[in-house]
């Protein structure tokens, strides 16, 4: 998982889901797990 400043480009990818956990924003992509990231 990468830690990124901006998730805007990742959430446009096909299969991307934006999820909030414990006040942090995550992008999870089951189609392409390379694009899994947390905002920080």
Swiss-Prot record:
List UniProt keywords, sorted A-Z. Answer: Ribonucleoprotein, Ribosomal protein
**A Pfam short name:** Ribosomal_L36
Instruction: Offer a single GO CC term for the protein.
Output: ribonucleoprotein complex
Gene Ontology terms describing biological process: translation
Q: Output the SUPFAM superfamilies linked to this UniProt entry.
A: Ribosomal protein L36
Which organism encodes this protein?
Answer: Corynebacterium aurimucosum (strain ATCC 700975 / DSM 44827 / CIP 107346 / CN-1) (Corynebacterium nigricans)
InterPro entries with a match to the protein in the record: Ribosomal_bL36 (IPR000473), Ribosomal_bL36_sp (IPR035977), Ribosomal_L36_bact (IPR047621)
Q: Give the family from UniProt.
A: Belongs to the bacterial ribosomal protein bL36 family.
Domain of life, source organism: Bacteria
Give GO terms: molecular function aspect only.
structural constituent of ribosome
What name does UniProt use for this protein? Large ribosomal subunit protein bL36
